[in-house]
Amino acid sequence: MVSYVGSLNYGYNDKYYAGFSFRRDGSSRLAPDTRWGNFWAVSASWRLSQENFMKPWENVVSDMKLRASYGVNGNLPTGYYGYHGTYTTGAFYNGKPAPWEDAIANPDLTWEKNYALNLGVDLSLFRRVNLTFDWYTRTTKDLLMSKQLNSISGFGSIL
């Protein structure tokens, strides 16, 4: 596996923050046409407690920050040869070892992608009580899973 990684973070006036990260991964577990995957994330936050309209409540609300992030990451298949068929010689035909295909090729095998969204609030009250609220959702696309095949094919499943 080969990876290229980069990130960029920016803060302004101790109130506003933004971030971006990018990752490009390549793996020999996938076919040459689908070997490389691009994965990224963006984030932003706003410290409301630094705003002038929060000054009347600064003895109660010590710190308050709104956060949001969205991004995609990838997973690889667990096997090494999923994108091309494999053969074995565990059987005999007419008294001699005979090779037979034990796994079907899947040239379309690609990265499984997880898209995640996180929204949150960090809150500090009276400089003593810290609270964190998060809402999180994740959607998976191109799920890597074994699909059952008809037994007449001679194979049980394909990835």
Regions found by a protein language model. Give the residues of each.
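Extracellular/periplasmic, surface-exposed regions of secreted and cell-surface proteins
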Residues: 1-159
